[in-house]
Amino acid sequence: MKIIFYFFIIVFTMQLNAQNNYPIVLIHGFMGWGEDEMGEYNYWGGNKSYADMIRESGNTVFELSVGPVSSNWDRAVEAYYQLKGGQVDYGNSHSKKYNIEQKPSNKIYKGLYPQWDENNPIHIIGHSMGGQTARMLQYLLSQEFFINEGTNQKEESNLLGDTHNRWIKSITSISTPHDGTTLTEIVTKTIPFIQYFVGVAGVIGTRFYDFDLDHWRFKMKNNESWTNYLNRMKQHSAWETKNISSWDLSLDGARELNNHLQASADVYYFSIVTSTTE
């Protein structure tokens, strides 16, 4: 799998060089992490860094870090502000609907690519849930959102209050469950939560990894054990809403997303599929 993925990255980069040199944005999937967040172990490449390999070929690469268990809406909003800069704003209407903090005070970014606009577009590569997140970002960029349905009062955020067409040149998804997956049922119900995350906890240590749910007013306490942290997260009310990864990745959740996330005529779409057997 790693060899296939590496080959794809190289071929894709060569094709990009033949046409343009727009930045490449990498969006991780469910339970993923950003650059340097797990020491020398990379989400994109493991012991190697695919991002650095692409950079060596002359391309600009941005590796984002969005909520590992958050919904695609929340992840897409975070992706926008990490690139463009500013304080994350999940939207007035969305925040009230799900009782989350609209503008978390700790989520303010300088911007990896502040000049991002229709004249300076990007290519996005999303792995697993990251492919859904990329499509959600394109959707949010292409629409105007209003604080209340039936009114003409627009959202005040830079992202949601106006349209931003042709900001994305291409979206490539790798192993993305665009139609949902039954795996989420296994993760959230069949397999105990602690068992599922114990491998992650063993790799990253006690303070290295954060589930980034500050907008749900949830964070690891000082000197809190991993076991207690995970148990509290397991019981959090967020899992009972539609504003969470388990819903977006489910069959019903993905179907609901697909009703909104229509393909744009201005974007090139590529999908790399994989399969596995027991």
How would you label these PLM feature ranges?
Residues I3-Q15:
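Sec-dependent N-terminal signal peptides
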Residues M1-I4, T190:
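Structural motif marking the loop-to-transmembrane transition
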Residues I9-F12, K84, M233:
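Generic alpha-helical secondary structure signal
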